[in-house]
């Protein structure tokens, strides 16, 4: 009783912003551009709580008057069966084979109406559409399977189980493995797995690949010697000497100890010292070329750089000791030149700001307008997406409610009889009500319903060779879970949502195509025209004069 106002609100919602019920993978922002069926459309198809309450009140009033409760329910079921039979007859007449009329050449005197024939042939060819190939004899859709082969039937049953499992699982917590896994002889029919497990397997695979891949070997390269022009200091040289005491040659240490000696070494000694340093470095890196740890490599780098720096500083000081004054003059001239450049740049900036001061207000206004437009567009998009999500959730909830109510109405008579039989000995009203609510056996349906069910019909058609085939026994046991559920209801948009995730070659595979046709025709009862139109848009097959279906 508390849910009735919610249904009223849903019924009074506007038509704008509704979504299509089938394509859940489309972008939600595109939904308001193409408005489809609104929630008012659901009143025609979905039995909501209001209608169910009206029906239950009518039953209560009729029972109070004196009419039999079970008699009313039997009348309702009889009416429904008559309506279903009439619908079946109409469909059979529509799908009945009608031989094509021969288009004969019509002569009126000496004229031949060939143009009319060409137009007629074009219209006939345009009605036929291309479909994925489905076998005729070895096919679970065919009425007789006496001459059918075992292997194709087994593959079709595996694909059928995978499809039924994908249609009935909770996609928020579980996902199906690929369709190819359903033909595995160890686990025929495929299986589901949790999203948590899939993510864990992916992370484990990435870690294993990272562990297998060989690490990249880093080759140590000696950096090139750079000559610095800065003024050397005695303090820096002594510090560098203390750092480079373990990696420098004895000649370089002698040079760094006596930077201002009266007997400067010759150029040959400098060259030999640099060569000795390079030889020592190469000799330290060449033997065995074993990969060192990162800390050792960094320490060796620091030692070599300090040794090289001391050598270059001493060489530059000995060469450019008499020309220190010229260097100072050059530094002064460079500083004056930099000051001139800064003054010129400041003057240019002041002139440019005065010129741009007139342009800035116009640019600010245009930027503000564009920002406002972007914000409005973004907020409208968010509103549209939220509205579309709300309508899709409401429609899905409406479909679930309809399925549950149809099941309750279908089993209402049988459940009522069982509850009535629970009053074997009338003792106390409260105790009898508790007995009635405590134990109610599950209703398995009558013989007529079982005979018309798709699972029992399929079992009666299958050949004995297939039933004795060992892998087929496993898949038949798995299909029994879905076959014994007489109240299994699957909506067409759920089927299209699952098929949207399949690849094109999987949709066109003969075994999978047969399983899809079986589910569409016998379980979901989806119109063939709707499925063909969806398939044309999914596969983008051009309309042609030939058909690959039966």
Curated annotation (Swiss-Prot):
InterPro entries: DUF4698 (IPR031526). The keyword Coiled coil applies. PANTHER family: COILED-COIL DOMAIN-CONTAINING PROTEIN 60. Residues 235-256 have a biased composition (Low complexity). Residues 336-345 have a biased composition (Polar residues). Residues 1-21, 219-293, 336-367 are annotated as: Disordered. It comes from Homo sapiens. This is Coiled-coil domain-containing protein 60. Residues 71-98 form a coiled coil. Keywords: Coiled coil.
